[in-house]
């Protein structure tokens, strides 16, 4: 059984998948906050081969390692010049966040041969571009939806903290809705700009805030759950599957 782990800045997402299973055909899937991580020990016990993407630092890596089955074959996923049909065009390939690299691999596996814009919407929002020939050419990083909303509350005297999960009208007639409309537009703009800049690109949106941000997009797109885990699965197996946005 293969265990795939996506350790992000706020949560750790994971999936178990049988050898030979189709791309993204999980046997089990879950998530936990960093504080709750110990609860996954029993779930992870069946993972004999493990692939981990970790962007949350060495302390969390040590906690993850301590929870894995003794004797498990563990690979700490890293950005490399090439993997799973994707060529890493970052100026220094090793400096590309491993989660972004995995997400691009996942998108490429789902939509082979297509130009791609891959948006992952979590604590931060990343918007990355992959050419049809499989070259990752770079991207954008911006504060995530909730972080944008909370920064206004922290740094202005009279603006309230708002829930970034509520869908507002375009023109808010109260301060909360005006903030939410503003931050949604600020999230959608870079994605739409990337699609326009790449030209006729397939757009894949993933992450916890993806359903809210997708509602504001004016370009064709598809929301794909757990694109980093899909990418880890593709990186480990070479599997592809086709989807259309």
Where are the language model's segments positioned?
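Gly/Thr-rich phosphate-binding beta-strand-loop-beta motif of the actin/hexokinase/Hsp70
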Residues: 1-23, 107, 111-136, 152, ...
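Glycine-rich phosphate-binding loops at beta-strand->alpha-helix junctions
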Residues: 11, 53-62, 181, 200-217
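Short loop/helix-cap segments at secondary-structure boundaries that form the rim of catalytic
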Residues: 65-69, 84-86, 212-219
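Active-site regions of enzymes building and remodeling cell-envelope glycoconjugates
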Residues: 68-74, 91-93, 218-226
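Active-site neighborhood for divalent-cation/phosphate handling
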Residues: 76-118, 124-127, 171-172
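Active-site rim beta-loop-alpha module in soluble metabolic enzymes
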Residues: 142-198
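Glycine-rich phosphate-binding/hydrolytic loop that grips phosphoryl groups
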Residues: 221-245
């Amino acid at each position: 059984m293969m265990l795939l782990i996506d350790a992000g800045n706020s949560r750790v997402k994971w999936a178990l998948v049988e050898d030979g299973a189709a791309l993204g055909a999980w046997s089990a899937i879950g998530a936990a906050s960093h504080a709750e991580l110990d609860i996954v020990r029993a779930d992870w016990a069946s993972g004999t081969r493990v692939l981990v993407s970790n962007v949350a630092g060495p302390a969390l890596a040590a906690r993850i390692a301590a929870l894995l089955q003794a004797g498990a074959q563990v690979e700490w996923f890293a950005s490399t010049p090439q993997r799973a049909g994707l060529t890493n065009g970052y100026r220094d390939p090793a400096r590309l966040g491993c989660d972004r690299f995995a997400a691009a691999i996942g998108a490429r596996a789902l939509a082979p041969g297509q130009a791609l814009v891959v948006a992952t919407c979590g604590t931060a929002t990343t918007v990355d571009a992959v050419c049809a020939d499989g070259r990752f050419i770079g991207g954008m990083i911006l504060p995530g939806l909730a972080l944008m909303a909370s920064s206004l509350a922290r740094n202005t005297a009279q603006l309230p903290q708002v829930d970034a999960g509520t869908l507002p009208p375009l023109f808010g007639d109260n301060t909360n809705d005006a903030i939410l409309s503003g931050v949604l537009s600020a999230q959608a703009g870079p994605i739409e700009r990337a699609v326009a800049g790449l030209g006729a690109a397939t757009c894949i949106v993933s992450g916890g805030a993806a359903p809210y941000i997708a509602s504001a997009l004016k370009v064709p797109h598809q929301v794909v759950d757990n694109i980093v885990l899909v990418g880890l699965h593709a990186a480990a197996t070479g599997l592809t599957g086709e989807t259309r946005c």
